[in-house]
């Protein structure tokens, strides 16, 4: 079905067409090779912004550290990180004055959460720097390794399962003179393959014990591993992002919990809400400014952009903020919250894999690991890399760079939003004490500023004052990249406002199409995406109908399941034709079995199996949904599954879709090649972990699962649960006396084994 694109724009107001200018179709750019160069850029830039600060040396690690706090006031428009402590504290005080009790209440909420959070909270999240192996791992594995090492070093608070107790272990681990860890290493040897008689490299994995002295351990505990941010659209250059290790994560989580609680109470904060809720919040602020700017007042809005937000923020400022916010709280709570910023003030950035060199003439390739950058002769490098390495050298220790100023990307989004909002809050007339006043929206580093004043000079004065106030707390509004407009037209976090929010539909484009999970899930996700966009993003009925037809076409090509009566020849067409001919009710065949498409924009909410169930031949129903059919997935199917969809910006979103278990909901098997690599040990750990969790869930069906109170291990919990259940089953006659006795005996044996261990 071909569409002439100009027809789409005949009746579209220009501002609605903005989304077509976004770089969101096609594949996003990915990075290849190492992120070492990007990381060095980040470290060097961060130090450059704070270069007039004071240098000190960390007594424990020997790392040189730069402290720009209370540094010189800026004299030009260059970005700088010289935040003034007293200004930040004053901004906090005014924020509290305009929102009485906000900090107090948020602290109380956070304290409750701190006491209830289980350590398994840290298994959420993707790649995490695993300090025991000195590389990235899935979060759950990294946590398991950390706890295992702590345990073998005599730290056992974490076994109670509360996150706060685990953090006590982290604190104690930093005082230890040495830590013993188990690391994996690879042995490679050349052997002759019996079958092919060729020489092949065989890899074996060994585990070895290694002792880290206090200094080496501290460096690892304070290390953030760095990677290149992938799939960033609309940028020419890539940039580095950081993943912290398990020691830092728990502390950051609690700080962000507190900051999130504060953000929820601030009308100018674009976090932590999203989607329609966020739009409503923003529209409120705009409405307030529009109604208050009577006929006599002008109102202008700046679509703001800050220069290098993260690199000019400073953990020492965050420490000052936390100290102020928690000032009337118990000592233990203040201590727990102040550790994250302190660790960040002493952080080390791991430089990644290093550089790859190749000699074209000799056909040689060699990797220069980051550890060697401190001592290698610079003549091998090109001009720009040489400059980078020269600048970073004084900061290097064991392949990591000391990075005291700056916050790596995405670490304290909520807390930095609180700082931004505190400056927006100073725009009230009672604080500006003049004819201009401002308000706005802040979401991490993105902001929109609305300034009202009786005339243009007043607007200019207001913007200048805002700009200078920001400078005092280390926020640098970019004069080049921010632009000002009459209020009513602006952009904030990729939402476009034009007398109301315009749907920026292009952002959703990447999530249209076939996901590639399996035939059943893909069909369901595809129609759900279209349905959601009709609800949330102004996807009109005609366009939705077209999107649906394109999706079905795409789906049929992906799975080679063209209609049974089609002329198209594929590998599956022979079988599908046969099925088509022997089916009485052809409308009942699923699209993936060569059936017709019965979806239209009215029935997108119904799973395809349900939509066609009444139309199916009986034997087809039996094959499709028979639990004894070996191709039907046997795990208990929830009625709702979660798919990961990729919107154009921001992290992958989780989207719910209806799941019906059929022969089409297969799960692909894991690639075998992983079994021959260094990851094999990790895979076994992961499977072990999985088995334990599955077993635990068998004992505690979700209905009876309460947050564990008191301190007991998973095994103890399961044993006591087994005893209770057995007794109830025995007394109600569901099990015989012999079975009851056998269960009790097994429980005792398990307890005995635990005691011996």
From Swiss-Prot:
PTM entry text: Phosphorylated by host PRKCA.
EC number: 2.7.7.48
Location (main, coarse): host cell
Catalyzed reactions per annotation: RNA(n) + a ribonucleoside 5'-triphosphate = RNA(n+1) + diphosphate
Gene Ontology CC annotations of this record: host cell cytoplasm; host cell nucleus
Keywords: Eukaryotic host gene expression shutoff by virus, Eukaryotic host transcription shutoff by virus, Host cytoplasm, Host gene expression shutoff by virus, Host nucleus, Host-virus interaction, Inhibition of host RNA polymerase II by virus, Nucleotide-binding, Nucleotidyltransferase, Phosphoprotein, RNA-directed RNA polymerase, Transferase, Viral RNA replication, Viral transcription
Signal peptide: none
Class in the EC hierarchy, top level: transferase
Motif window: Nuclear localization signal: 187-195, 203-216
Region annotation Promoter-binding site: where it falls in the sequence: 249-256
RdRp catalytic domain: residues covered: 286-483
One example of a Gene Ontology biological process annotation: viral transcription
Similarity remark: Belongs to the influenza viruses polymerase PB1 family.
Protein's name in the database: RNA-directed RNA polymerase catalytic subunit
Source species: Influenza A virus (strain A/Duck/England/1/1956 H11N6)
Origin organism lineage: Viruses, Riboviria, Orthornavirae, Negarnaviricota, Polyploviricotina
Gene that encodes the chain: PB1
